[in-house]
């Protein structure tokens, strides 16, 4: 091989090395950008999921309140009905008074029917909204890899997946309940997180549940990479 051919060969090798290093650097920048975008997406979706969960809790409380109101109305109407029937028995034979009392009973029945219909309509509307919220929660669950289950002991179990890139289906979980002091109580964390107690105290003070979920997920991710 002559000197000119050797020089041309060395030049080709250098050009190939420069192109390879440039592409490697460019690909690394793209990967880092995608990683940051993914983290932002996860954080935003976690916050939306928290809002949906809070709305579900409010809807459940409203439905319970409506049911309690209906029970109270039923009891009140029954008491009034009993009183009216007692009065009818006392004035039996007095046609005019009986007619008045009968009209009162009819009014009470109509009032009860109206209130029952109002509460029933509100319950149906709330149930439909809960279905929509559950559908949204399922969508966020699929995107975030987060599943929420109700387990014995009045607890909710939060199960994260897509944490470990090598094993996306591997579950990372913890349980949550409300103690007698009306505070969040976190337990049964797997794998164990040293920082979980700190996260628990913070969510008790701030009541920012979406931030709590985001912090726990980040801690699980960090544990995998460490």
From Swiss-Prot:
One of its GO terms (biological process) is attachment of spindle microtubules to kinetochore. Pfam families: Spindle_Spc25. The keyword Coiled coil applies. Residues 1-146 are annotated as: Interaction with the N-terminus of SPBC24. Signal peptide: none annotated. Residues 1-58 are annotated as: Interaction with the NDC80-NUF2 subcomplex. Gene3D superfamilies: 6.10.250.1950. The modification Phosphoserine is found at residue 12. Component of the NDC80 complex, which consists of NDC80/HEC1, CDCA1, SPBC24 and SPBC25. The NDC80 complex is formed by two subcomplexes composed of NDC80/HEC1-CDCA1 and SPBC24-SPBC25. Each subcomplex is formed by parallel interactions through the coiled-coil domains of individual subunits. Formation of a tetrameric complex is mediated by interactions between the C-terminal regions of both subunits of the NDC80/HEC1-CDCA1 subcomplex and the N-terminal regions of both subunits of the SPBC24-SPBC25 complex. Belongs to the SPC25 family. Acts as a component of the essential kinetochore-associated NDC80 complex, which is required for chromosome segregation and spindle checkpoint activity. Required for kinetochore integrity and the organization of stable microtubule binding sites in the outer plate of the kinetochore. The NDC80 complex synergistically enhances the affinity of the SKA1 complex for microtubules and may allow the NDC80 complex to track depolymerizing microtubules. This is Kinetochore protein Spc25. The lineage of its organism: Eukaryota, Metazoa, Chordata, Craniata, Vertebrata.
